[in-house]
Amino acid sequence: MNEAVKDSEWYRQKFLYPNGTLKNKLNITDAAELAQKEYLGSGIRAVTFLRKNKKISSVEDLKKIHKIMFGWLYDWAGQIRDYELVKGETEFLEYSRINFGIEEIDEKIQQLSSKKELANVDYAFLLDRLNYLHPFREGNGRSSKLFLQAFAANHGQVIDYPRSNKDLIIAQNNADIDQIASLIRVNAKAKKAAH
């Protein structure tokens, strides 16, 4: 573990204002206001990104997506974390092993890229590994879902995630790939009508 991370004061100073709100480029210190701006701004950027039909080939693309979604708000957007991360009782991949996690995901993406269509379990596997990797301070779920949605588009598919994140988060925290697969739906991408 990075020695500095053991010092929670270091962590607070790096990421948080004194009231506990994430430090941000807009200097918003009200957590509710920040959350509202973050969700709206990241959502608009996500839609814009999907319309560009980018090819997904590695975790490098996830870093770019995270930077697009959150770079307007956070200095650390798109940067792989260099510290240990625990949320509640969930521990994510140790920082010292992050490169191994990235390699595993990249290898799976390369393996799946040659397939015409992917199954729910293929996306569930990647979603599980991305969740455990948890490469960023915040925004991991949204950027991972966008990353996989773009990867699905590369295969002429669309992923429908459940309306409520609760069951999906539980399945991810339990690393239950079968449960994750049962919660997502993979459909053929609708073709645009010719005018």
PLM segments and residue spans:
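FIC/Doc superfamily catalytic core
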Residues: 1-195
